[in-house]
Amino acid sequence: MSTLKLIPFSTSIDKQFSGRTSILGGKCCLQIDGPKTTKKQSKILVEKIRERISNGKVVEISASAYDTAWVAMVPSREMSGRPSFPECLDWIVENQNPDGSWGLNPFLVKDSLSCTLACLLALRKWGLPNHLLHKGIEFIESNISRAATDDENQVAPIGFNIIFPAMISYAKELDLTLTLPPSSLNALLRARDSEMIRREGKWEYVGEGLGDSCNWNQIIQKHQSRNGSLFNSPATTAAAAIHCRDHKCFDYLISVVNKCNGWAPTVYPMDIYARLCMIDTLQRLGIDCHFRVELDAIFDEIYRNWQEREEEIFSDVTCQALAFRLLRVKGYDVSSDGLEEFVEQEGFFNSVSMQHSNVGTVLELYRASQTRINEEENTLQKIHAWTKPFLTQQLLNKTIRHKPLQMQVEYDLKNFYGTVDRFQHRRTIDLYDAQASQILKTAYRCSAIHNEDFIRFSVQNFKICRAEYQKELDEINKWYAYFGMDLLSKGRNACEQAYVVTAGLIADVELSMARISFAQVILLITVFDDVFDRYGTREEALAVIHLIKEILTHYRWKAAPKECSQLVKTTFTALYDTVNETAAKAHALQGFCFKQQIISLWEELLECAVREKESLSGKNVSTLDEYLSFAPVTIGCELCVLTAVHFLGIQVSEEMLTSAEMLTLCWHGNVVCRLLNDLKTYSREREEKTVNSVSVQVGVSEEEAVAKVKEVLEYHRRKVVEMVYQSQGSNVPRECKELVWKTCKVAHCFYGYDGDEFSSPRDIVDDIKAMMFLGLPHLSTH
């Protein structure tokens, strides 16, 4: 009998990239073991975050010196000798950095060079103060060698190799003297030529770097959005306005400058994308549950945007993939047909503009492809077929220079379905940087994506939850020892294993009884597993089942007879008292008694365990179908879920719990967990001559048998996902359905790696330690 066995670990612990991807992530702003947080502090942060979410349409984004400079270069429609946007020139004059540069982050040298040269061009074009020019020129001349080197640690803005040489040429036209080493100029020109060849005509997004060589009227005809912009880029739109005086381009630029009070961001608008990123961030930090009402309102609005085919979503493949994934997982009816043009790698890179042809965008497509819910969704299957090997190759080639992005790609590729909530929350906390920049044609920050309040509250919330988890673990240990089950574990760290799994999937601090009851079921199943497999006899197993049948027959508990062995008394009494107490607490909350249903489930599980034990070498099981008719029950997914759902903070009914929908969902969950376990352990179980979904298949090779099991697993996993994600026509609360899927994700986590369940990879053990024991980072107060 193989149950949801867990990884033993020690509780004694010594004290590109390009595109919309964070480029300065990591732990640089974090310190370990900060002051003890309070619930009062958390409440203050909750209100601050709630206010920000409620004002979500006001997306705060940093000013772009680069884009502001290009807008400043646009001449007036009435008088070409004057700037159309003098307020942008004022902003440039007022925002030069002390070192003579312009730009958001001095560590991004290529970005600073690009921003600085663009600002110098604007100042020179309109004859503004020379002292600003001199300081800017000195900065460029001092740092130009760093722009001309292919330093893998130097992150370049999108199109830098095309735009920067073009701006140097434009500087000559304006008699702006730059004394640059010939070697640096030659290196920049070689990089430009290489980039032009590599991009194969996909240059429109960086059209300002091509100047008169562009057919601007054709670009406008092909790419102009309803808001008048080109690619929602003020810089590209400004270049178009300079070259062909398009009135819609001017109208867009006027709206941007008016909205931003005299400057331009590097992308506008980005309201929808920023709010999607905010939701994704709050979910990954584990604090979205505190803002359900506010986030649901945003989801409803974005779904309306999706139905109306809002241009901001569908003109941006990154935004579209992210919106699709978040909406589908939330339960909205969204079709994957809109992603059809990205089903092939070549077609993707030929169809998207430069700002989307990056690892970050491909990662979003890969994540979206994992939400496939039926066999007919060939679009998602085809996207998955190329995005996974593409991302894998990027890792092998070490072309992802941004470490946090590299780590995220590694984690998602390794075991996408095995993402345990609390593990992910802690991992995100460790990687999160509230001061991180993102980069397009220049670096920018958006407070809806990287926000200090988010990380502060996440850390405080994690500490509060962890304190509760430690208390609950103590309760579990006492309960386990009270019934003498610790004497049966034979050194297995059972309580810690079971509880970490439970807290990993039921994270909300208020759901204490749900965690405790779920963990108790895991532990009881594990004890009976040991009794049946290791310590007990067939007669003792049957004795326990007989006692349970007595309860079902007489509708009352009956203590184990004196003549029963101590093993029978210990296991039955633990089950007897625990089910009694859990049922009483559930009755008080829900108003009905579910005891008989749970007892029936225990009877079924133990009878199937006996049958599994008696099916050694598969002699009594002739087919895979026959094996699947009983073996999945012994994994315990259904029993764990139907016990814990009473304590999820929602009202449930007996009719719902016994409905065909709920029982079908639990059955699919049982099969997923069972087959994952089988795929992990079939080699060992073959040696032990234990029946398994692989070994039961006769007349085929082991490779064919494994392939068949994986095929069946994929079918049932897709069924679970479909039933969880689809809300239309469902009578089962989302919280109950998610508990089944999260249980499957735990099985994916612990069985989805190489090795067996008792020799898990180092990173899982590290996740466990980080979740329960290691010091949490904190931000210094100021």
From Swiss-Prot:
Residue positions binding Mg(2+) 1: 529, 533
Enzyme Commission (EC) number: 4.2.3.183, 4.2.3.131
Motif DDXXD motif: chain residues: 529-533
InterPro entries, A to Z: Isoprenoid_synthase_dom_sf, Terpene_synth_N, Terpene_synth_N_sf, Terpene_synthase-like, Terpene_synthase_metal-bd, Terpenoid_cyclase/PrenylTrfase
Sites where the protein binds Mg(2+) 2: 529, 533
Record SUPFAM superfamilies: Terpenoid cyclases/Protein prenyltransferases, Terpenoid synthases
One GO BP annotation of this record: terpenoid biosynthetic process
Residue positions binding Mg(2+) 3: 677, 685
Keyword Protease: no
Gene Ontology MF annotations: magnesium ion binding; miltiradiene synthase activity; terpene synthase activity
Cofactor: Mg(2+)
Catalysed reactions listed for this entry: (+)-copalyl diphosphate = miltiradiene + diphosphate; (+)-copalyl diphosphate + H2O = nezukol + diphosphate
Tissue localization of expression: Highly expressed in leaves, and, at low levels, in stems, but barely in roots and flowers.
Bound cofactor: record note: Binds 3 Mg(2+) ions per subunit.
Keyword annotations from UniProtKB, A to Z: Lyase, Magnesium, Metal-binding
Pathway membership: Secondary metabolite biosynthesis; terpenoid biosynthesis
Cellular component aspect of the GO annotation: chloroplast
Note in the entry: Abietane diterpenoids (e.g. miltiradiene, abietatriene and ferruginol) accumulate specifically in the periderm of roots. The ent-kaurene diterpenoid oridonin, main constituent of Isodon rubescens, accumulates in leaves.
Family to which the UniProt record says this protein belongs: Belongs to the terpene synthase family.
Domain notes: The Asp-Asp-Xaa-Xaa-Asp/Glu (DDXXD/E) motif is important for the catalytic activity, presumably through binding to Mg(2+).
Functional note: Involved in the biosynthesis of ent-kaurene diterpenoids natural products such as oridonin, miltiradiene, eriocalyxin B and nezukol, known to exhibit antitumor, anti-inflammatory and antibacterial activities. Catalyzes the conversion of (+)-copalyl diphosphate ((+)-CPP) to nezukol and miltiradiene.
The protein's name in its UniProt record: Nezukol synthase KSL3
Originating species: Isodon rubescens
Chain's gene name: KSL3
